Amino acid sequence: MGEFMNKKDMFVLGIETSCDETAAAIVKNGREIVANVVASQMESHQRFGGVVPEIASRHHVEQITLVLEETMKQANMDISQLDAIAVTEGPGLVGALLIGVNAAKALAFAHRIPLVGVHHIAGHIYANQLVQEMKFPLLALVVSGGHTELIYMKEHGIFEVIGETRDDAAGEAYDKVARALQLPYPGGPHIDRLAKQGKPIIDLPRAWLEEGSYDFSFSGLKSAVINTLHNAKQRGEMIRPEDMAASFQASVVEVLVRKTIEAAMHYSVKQILLAGGVAANEGLRTQLQKQMDQLPEVELVIPPLSLCTDNAAMIAAAGTVLFQQGKRATMALNANPSLLL
């Protein structure tokens, strides 16, 4: 314990319960993970083909105390040694968020520790800070189940959304296409795996939208996949699921990557960060790395898989920055399911 308990060090506890992961973590100086615990509920939601909010909330209630205890044990620390507690206040499922927010408030109140509210997407972006120091100005491509956004940052804590989805998020489209292909939930990893065995030979649309727009649209693509499968079935034709997965993924990835590269050029950024659950997608990671040749001056940062999906280390990392900027939450902090960045 002694060797890393230098009092100049700052220890922040992060708590994340926005969807179907109950997570807590302790991060040192905003960069170094001391403890990181995630209890996933994926199996409970699998048979429903999506996250059931009521079930998610019940699981969070069951898990939160255990997860917090395990985190303190992993870190070999006492709560009194924490400098701050950071918690996801939104966006997400209101019942799920409430569990984390109330746990954080209870700990902060009982132990007189400063409390910081964190935006879930800011957390995903700051997961990269655990890998590499952020260099501004930067561009973050955030791709998850509920979000697909291009975010420009010229300094810490300032987020400018320069592009977002106009309908389905990429992760949502993956889940719906996976269902059409009779693949299990969540769809992303299954399509990613299947795509490697197929060829992108099916002609599917790519929504570029109007000139100069960094927005995304995936509902037309999703409908095209469903219609193509339906029409083939009507005609008694067989479409290889591998080829459909490869074709769908090629369409999504091409749009995501091209718009990211164009925005990075336009905004003259020093870094591109990949963030969110779909950032774990191998097709996306590979294509983005390939296209970086066009931007020799720009550094690409991709977090390890464990930091792409929901976790609390990213919330602690983002919370550290907010805490250092003097941001504090009061005991009136509440879950905000539609919180804007």
UniProtKB/Swiss-Prot annotation:
It catalyses: L-threonylcarbamoyladenylate + adenosine(37) in tRNA = N(6)-L-threonylcarbamoyladenosine(37) in tRNA + AMP + H(+). It comes from the Bacteria. One of its GO terms (molecular function) is N(6)-L-threonylcarbamoyladenine synthase activity. Its main location: cytoplasm. Its cofactor is Fe(2+). One of its GO terms (cellular component) is cytoplasm. GO terms for biological process: tRNA threonylcarbamoyladenosine modification. It is found in: Cytoplasm. Substrate binds at V142, V143, S144, G145, G146, D175, G188, D192, N281. Coiled coil: none annotated. Binds 1 Fe(2+) ion per subunit. Fe cation binds at H120, H124, D310. It is an enzyme of class 2 (transferase). PANTHER family: TRNA N6-ADENOSINE THREONYLCARBAMOYLTRANSFERASE, TRNA N6-ADENOSINE THREONYLCARBAMOYLTRANSFERASE, MITOCHONDRIAL. Required for the formation of a threonylcarbamoyl group on adenosine at position 37 (t(6)A37) in tRNAs that read codons beginning with adenine. Is involved in the transfer of the threonylcarbamoyl moiety of threonylcarbamoyl-AMP (TC-AMP) to the N6 group of A37, together with TsaE and TsaB. TsaD likely plays a direct catalytic role in this reaction. This is tRNA N6-adenosine threonylcarbamoyltransferase. It comes from Anoxybacillus flavithermus (strain DSM 21510 / WK1).
